[in-house]
Amino acid sequence: MANNEEHPPRGNEWEVVSLTSSAYAAAPGPYNVESRDVRKYDAYYGAETSRDLYMSEHFVFPPSEHENLPIDESLFVAEQRKDGRDLMLEGQGLSDQFHYEAGNNQQSIYGESALGSSRHMESFGSESAVYEHGLVDAEGNLDLHSDGEGEKDVKKSTHNLPCEAWWKRRAISMYSRTREANAIWSLFFAAAVTGLVVLGQRWQQERWQVLQLKWQSSISSEKLGRVLEPLSRLKDVIVRSNPQASLVRSGSSSEV
């Protein structure tokens, strides 16, 4: 009530105040600091006054101020509840662009909320992926560190072993190496034996071939001897039957 008494309503001030182009073009006065209640009051009733002035068509608003006029939310809600809200808006001198801009504002609000939720989900997913990646890296580093420590522990244990255990370890390693060497030597020995067997078989084959040649040559010489033996006998018989001819031949041969 105190606020209403101190500041009377300004809804009908335009009826008594004559606005001219020179007064409208004049520069605004100095900025006065007002209280919070006064600002709310001025914003509400100033919006109503400006709307009434605009409806009265006393003057034309500049484009910049026409676009930034405050909107009376109570009037807008009341008119939306009516069936002919578009007609009412047109009757008051407001264009359809007002309704279109309001719808766009609502859509932008929902779009921003959806975008914010999607961004929130994306950021949450990226943070979870980064967290999981960090866990995997940490586990890998722990595994590598544990492997390095295990190798160091094995080396220390080998250096700190007592003499008997060290000798047993060396004996086992030598036995494993000898087994590997024995396997290699066994393969080498088997290859050598197979080579000797092959060479022996070839030598036997060649020996049999030589024996066959000798036997064939002996057989041929025996056959030749058998053929020549009767001829030699025939010659002896002829010589014995003609002793003079043999003497003449012997004499002629001596003279020569």
UniProtKB/Swiss-Prot annotation:
InterPro entries: ATG8-IP-1/2 (IPR040304). Induction: By salt stress. It is a single-pass membrane protein. A motif (AIM (Atg8-family-interacting motif)) lies at residues 14-17, 208-211. Keywords: Autophagy, Chloroplast, Endoplasmic reticulum, Membrane, Plastid, Protein transport, Stress response, Transmembrane, Transmembrane helix, Transport. It is found in: Endoplasmic reticulum membrane; Membrane; Plastid, Chloroplast membrane. Its main location: endoplasmic reticulum. The keyword Cell membrane does not apply. One of its GO terms (cellular component) is intracellular membrane-bounded organelle. The keyword Transcription regulation does not apply. One of its GO terms (biological process) is protein targeting to vacuole involved in autophagy. The chain crosses the membrane at residues 181-200. It comes from the Eukaryota. Interacts with ATG8F. Interacts with ATG8H. Interacts with APE1 and PSBS/NPQ4. Involved in a special stress-induced plastid-to-vacuole protein trafficking pathway. Interacts with ATG8F in plastid bodies to subsequently enable their delivery to the vacuole by an autophagic pathway. Interacts with the plastid proteins APE1 and PSBS/NPQ4 and may recruit them as cargo into plastid bodies that may be recognized by the autophagy machinery for degradation in the vacuole. Involved in the alleviation of damage caused by salt stress during plant development, probably through its involvement in plastid-to-vacuole and ER-to-vacuole trafficking. Plants over-expressing ATI1 display increased ability of seed germination in presence of exogenous abscisic acid (ABA). Plants silencing ATI1 and ATI2 display decreased ability of seed germination in presence of exogenous ABA. This is ATG8-interacting protein 1.
